[in-house]
């Protein structure tokens, strides 16, 4: 009987080893490491061309790390409308600025002058843009329902005078209405989009011939904003409905916050964003409120009403250390909020925004805040610590840009707008 059990265990272990070897070979092959893949396949007697989904090994490792880290997270009550697997992934803490300290006026930093170049055009208004987490790609979405994907190194080559460079590497067509927002999967070559057709669509940009989505989530409302959880297993959707929708990427299930107030909430959501670890997420709403949610329980843990007077909040993003939130509103102000206390710690003034749903963003080091001045059609920059305005540059768009997006890893950003153009900004030589 014991020998039978040992044999069964040996067979099970052998099967796991074969699966692991197949995943390793497929991973190496998909990343163009053909010689290494061939050597491993030969040494382990694994078929070189075994069929395994791309990035399957990465996905399994990510799930394993998430499960390991979940042991340190507090549990979720059974009354909460979330699967037990949902939680945050711990990432290394990023060196950050303590914005709660008052910095003297006159001690502001100077941002290097930037220049921009037009890359491409949509057939109509360009409504949104997003960089990949590694800064290697960015995508734009238009009112013409198309999505364009650019490779940043090729953009730089083109700007440097390389006439052979072709930075536009993919164009996707699969929505029936204008695109509202975009996001990249944190670990896979997947780009998602949301649109006025109530859909969230998934595109695999590793496939050169793919023009259509391989997965579609159908919401009940216009999906105005989306954000991937850092694990890639869940995504947030902000819609015309006042309550954020949370989707399980694998099961298509939609979950709602368990304690969302029934009264005092009336506006659509303009933007949703996760923090860097997924431990908290935020909504910026047309009713003028900023709302913070626990990333594990999905409970609303703080609501800042009238954050921008009686004006709608157009954007809200976290600092990398998750201690502060930067918001923009149609009252022409940009504000920095301390999450723990809910108090405003900085206010950035001097740029008019009353018509467009413009964002305020940090640069990659969080030393500067960048936004748009509709009245002067300029890109405006403030020192993030002192709140001094330190630079303003003509946008070079015909009409004020409606979207601005900064690379997470270097000093480059993208603007796009009603003139249909996409402009790439970098430091002047």
From Swiss-Prot:
Pfam families in UniProt: WD40
Organism (species): Arabidopsis thaliana
Protein's name in the database: Cleavage stimulation factor subunit 50
Compartment(s): Nucleus
InterPro entries: CstF1-like, WD40/YVTN_repeat-like_dom_sf, WD40_repeat_CS, WD40_repeat_dom_sf, WD40_rpt
Source species, domain of life: Eukaryota
Keywords: mRNA processing, Nucleus, Repeat, WD repeat
Alphabetical list of CDD domains matching this protein: WD40
GO cellular component: mRNA cleavage stimulating factor complex
Domain notes from UniProt: N-terminus mediates homodimerization.
Role this protein plays: One of the multiple factors required for polyadenylation and 3'-end cleavage of pre-mRNAs. May be responsible for the interaction of CSTF with other factors to form a stable complex on the pre-mRNA.
The keyword Repeat belongs to this UniProt entry's keyword annotation: yes
GO biological process assignments: mRNA 3'-end processing
Major location (coarse): nucleus
Region (Hydrophobic): 20-41
Name of the gene this protein is made from: CSTF50
Subunit structure and binding partners: Homodimer. Belongs to the CSTF complex. Forms a complex with cleavage and polyadenylation specificity factor (CPSF) subunits CSTF64, PABN3, CPSF30, FIPS5 and CPSF100.
Gene3D superfamilies recorded: YVTN repeat-like/Quinoprotein amine dehydrogenase
WD repeat start-end pairs: 121-160, 174-213, 218-257, 264-303, 308-347, 351-392, 396-429
